[in-house]
Regions:
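Short beta-strand->loop
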Residues: 126-138, 192, 226-243
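A bilobed periplasmic-binding-protein/Venus flytrap-type ligand-binding module shared by bacterial periplasmic
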Residues: 142-153, 244-258
Length: 322
């Protein structure tokens, strides 16, 4: 488990690393894969990627070794639709992705709902689309706090005096939402929180008995069940959040309106295979079931994530914390 932090320090995301994960080469600052297309001279490519390349960042909600193949089909199909190269990058941290867009290193990015709050305020990220559920509505997920079955801890208040693994600072379901729940329960200063370094690591901390409780969101739960590494019948979920809107895919605020529109239209018309193909897929990673027919991605607006902006205000988090 990575360095532990007391709950009081969680509000300051400034402590996060500012780099991007490097896997493709020792000198690279990103985990990157490039999709080439033959139609780079199209009018769409001219407005969406005038330099011939579109850089697409993804938040590190799972390991890069999992996310790169999961997002490869989307990157490939998006590149074909736009007629340009798409460089796929998995950020090293939530803040790293925000700063990459702020510093002109990303043209578009998928942010977690909490990350989008800061990306909107700090980097001018413009929401384009998100993932639809089987009914064609914006898909959602939940945060949860789990304990081993038979644990004397059965509620948030009873967490006082116990250890709790959260995922990483800046995570919506792994930090902001459960931390606010502890505040509402009046035990925020009585629980020893440990930032495990990610959603899988938070789950592992509970599985290996390193903590008394752990935040496990519905997406991680589903992925771990599918992989056979988590049996929910042996654990108890003592708290569950209200539904959280799924990640928006955004464009940099410095991109031309025409470019933003071109990318949005391309996303809205991608085939379902872009989200469901492969051993690991976006749909399985984000735990949503796409519509049987129709658009897999639907338009989203900043207003749809208003609850996260309100939560940031309630926790006194601003872009100055970056």
């Amino acid at each position: 488990m990575k360095k532990l932090h007391h709950l009081a320090a969680a509000a300051c995301v400034v402590t996060l690393g500012l780099g991007l994960a490097a896997c493709s080469s020792s000198s690279s600052s990103t985990t990157t894969t490039t999709t080439n297309t033959a139609a780079s001279g199209s009018a769409v490519a001219h407005v969406a990627c005038p330099n011939g390349t579109l850089t697409f960042g993804v938040e590190p909600y799972d390991n890069a070794s999992v996310l790169i193949p999961a997002y490869q089909a989307l990157s490939t199909d998006l590149g074909k639709a736009l007629g340009c190269k798409v460089n796929l990058q998995v950020a090293e941290s939530y803040v790293a992705e925000i700063l990459a867009m702020k510093n002109g290193k990303l043209d578009m990015g998928e942010f977690g709902p909490a990350g989008f709050v800061f990306a909107s305020q700090q980097a001018g990220a413009v929401p384009l689309a998100s993932f639809a559920d089987s009914n064609g509505q914006l898909s959602t997920y939940t945060a949860g706090i789990w304990v081993k079955k038979g644990s004397p801890v059965t509620s948030l208040k009873q967490l006082a005096g116990h250890t709790l693994a959260l995922s990483s600072t800046g995570s919506t379901s792994g930090d902001w939402v459960p931390r606010y729940a502890l505040i509402q329960a009046g035990v925020q200063n009585k629980v020893k929180t440990e930032y495990a370094g990610g959603h899988p690591e938070s789950l592992e901390a509970l599985l290996h008995g390193k903590v008394d409780a752990a935040e496990i969101n519905s997406q991680t739960e589903a992925s771990a069940e599918k992989a056979g590494t988590f049996n929910p019948s042996q654990y108890t979920e003592i708290w569950k959040s209200q539904p959280i809107p799924n990640d928006p895919i955004t464009a940099s605020g410095t991109m031309s309106p025409a470019g933003q529109t071109a990318i949005k239209n391309a996303l809205l018309h991608l085939n379902a295979s872009a989200f469901t193909s492969g051993k690991t897929s976006i749909a399985s990673e984000l735990d949503f079931t796409p519509p049987a027919s129709g658009q897999v991605m639907i338009p989203v607006t900043t207003a749809m994530y208003g609850q996260l902006f309100a939560l940031a205000k309630a926790l006194s988090l601003t872009t100055s914390n970056l």
